[in-house]
Amino acid sequence: LHLHEVPDLPWSTVATDIFEWHCQHYLVVVDSYSGWFEIDLLKDLTSATVIKKLKRHFSVHGAPHTLISDNGRQFTSQRFKDFASQWDFRHVTSSPEYPQSNGLAERAVRSAKQLMEKSH
């Protein structure tokens, strides 16, 4: 298990995950420095849709040095690899045998679901 170091600057390392809530899919993006997270509703689960949402976050906060995700097909596609190269960030995936190694995003998903449940 590789533990991720706390970065020196906000939004230099972000973790992301996709979750389902009430039959809809959402993308969570969490800043490793502060723990701040943001959520987007996804119209579908394609790499193109995930990339579009990430570009919006990057246009506000700047592109990260490192993005951590699971091994979902949205993140392992050639299109996503090209996106990482074009936007010049390092993409790190969690271990396929141990997806909990993306714990920061997993915790943000739990918090997001709790907040959404309270506001529902």
Task: Report the location of each language-model feature.
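Retroviral integrase
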Residues: 1-114
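Short, solvent-exposed helix-loop connector elements
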Residues: 115-120
